[in-house]
Amino acid sequence: MKKSEIHFRIELDQNNVPEKILWDATDKPEIGFTESKAISLSLWDHEQKNTLRIDLWTKEMPVNEMKRFYIDCLGGLAQSVLTATGDENMSGEINSLCERLAVQVRKSE
């Protein structure tokens, strides 16, 4: 059986605030760690029937980039819902929310 691994390395300042987020994966085309400004990881706990989340971002990430990041995460969820369940209505509602949020972000820039 094939196995894949994803690794995260988080460099923290003296107050435990992320200064650098690095990641690597066995299936990534580039070799070595790649820097990112934010990660949002969700894991389904099937025993507790809830989601465990890890959200990290560097202190250097601008607020508008953070907003765009979360809008993009929601858009990815819309596609995942469609792929996993075939629920076009739910996927469409999430995409509609993304469009409204994107308009608000553009207005604030």
Spans of model-derived segments:
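Active-site- and interface-proximal helix/loop "cap" or "latch" segments in soluble metabolic
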Residues: 19-85
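Short loop/turn motifs at secondary-structure junctions and domain boundaries
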Residues: 1-4
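C-terminal charged interaction modules
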Residues: 78-109
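Active-site and channel-lining beta-strand-loop segments
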Residues: 6-25
